């Protein structure tokens, strides 16, 4: 977390998505395309920190990382956020 972006975990998910979350800008930005250059840089700095934490805590087999932009793009809340989900093979 810094002055420009935060990581928020969603504790509702279970199984392979437990402790997944979103990186959101502090300032209101509707989509990723509205972020400032500084917010984009801060987002990706924080993404590296989130990945390091998830690697250390959960040893995931992979990740889903992505943005939903606009209603037709699957966006339901109109505040930009980068979804970060860890994945584990369930055998």
Where does each model-flagged region fall?
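HIT superfamily nucleotide-processing domains
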Residues: 1-91
């Amino acid at each position: 977390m810094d002055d420009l972006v935060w990581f928020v975990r969603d504790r509702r998910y279970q199984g392979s998505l437990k402790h997944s979350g979103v990186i959101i800008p502090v300032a209101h930005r509707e989509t990723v395309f509205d972020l400032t250059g500084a917010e984009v840089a801060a987002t990706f700095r924080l993404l590296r920190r989130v990945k390091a934490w998830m690697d250390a805590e959960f040893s995931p087999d992979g990740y889903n990382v992505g943005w939903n932009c606009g209603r037709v793009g699957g966006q339901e809340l109109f505040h930009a956020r980068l979804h970060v989900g860890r994945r584990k093979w369930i055998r």
